[in-house]
């Protein structure tokens, strides 16, 4: 193997993974040269990477090396007038997207009495949406599978924060769903905020009968018997899993990702929406 010419090694590396190509430099100088070649990294770049770069709003693209382009895409890229965030996993090459709050459908989000829009310091997007008051929470995002990695199981996650003055978010679980035109369906339910035990005791005292009735309508308990709630992210936000779906080679499908809470009829507010992330499941 050590006696193989550089071009032959590059051909072999192109059929491995980005992780293997990154580590090849540790083998020998010939492997390092082969592992840095444009031929290898062209294989790992998304087929539409030039289009993605042309849509970029936060990079100056004067890089000639395909490996460096790959590294930049791993750092994430704002595209589509900064309404979407594109990213590839450094070691697997799998594609992820984040659809901003402006790029998804939020019922009544254009009415200032229901929602307010503002810049949030730890968001990559220029605006996030904060719920002021509503009795019907309906959120929907759409994505085409052709822009994602083929033959991959994906999860969709609503990125949120709950403000200190939030109310009405923990009385009734929200319903989540994933639907695609090819027939994939994933349905579940989750609470919109983490449940505080003291607040739960007060809620049961005042709303016990109503809560029992609603629990019969919307179940928000996972297979492990635990309540489904938002989970903390590394970026300071929280995420609510909406469901999962699979992509297939050569297939172009539209996936609808939704969260609704319309059965409780109670007023609610104080949840901040940053967008929906679509990423490969580990």
UniProtKB/Swiss-Prot annotation:
Keywords: Crown gall tumor, Ubl conjugation pathway
Assembly information from the UniProt record: Component of SCF(VBF) E3 ubiquitin ligase complex that interacts with VIP1. Interacts directly with SKP1A and VIP1. Forms a complex composed of VIP1, VBF and Agrobacterium virE2.
Keyword Cell division set for record: no
GO molecular function ontology, one term from the record: carbohydrate binding
Name of the gene this protein is made from: VBF
Pfam families for the chain: PP2 (PF14299)
Phenotype of the disrupted gene, per the record: Impaired Agrobacterium-mediated tumor formation.
The UniProt record lists the keyword Electron transport: no
Highest taxon, organism lineage: Eukaryota
InterPro entries per UniProt: F-box-like_dom_sf (IPR036047), F-box_dom (IPR001810), PP2-like (IPR025886)
PROSITE patterns for this protein: FBOX (PS50181)
Species of the source: Arabidopsis thaliana (Mouse-ear cress)
Signals that turn on the gene: By Agrobacterium.
Residues covered by the F-box domain: 1-44
UniProt-listed CDD domains: F-box_AtSKIP3-like
Name this protein carries in UniProt: F-box protein VBF
Function: Component of SCF(VBF) E3 ubiquitin ligase complexes, which mediate the ubiquitination and subsequent proteasomal degradation of target proteins such as VIP1 and Agrobacterium virE2, after their implication in T-DNA translocation to the host nucleus (can functionally replace Agrobacterium VirF). Required during Agrobacterium-induced tumor formation.
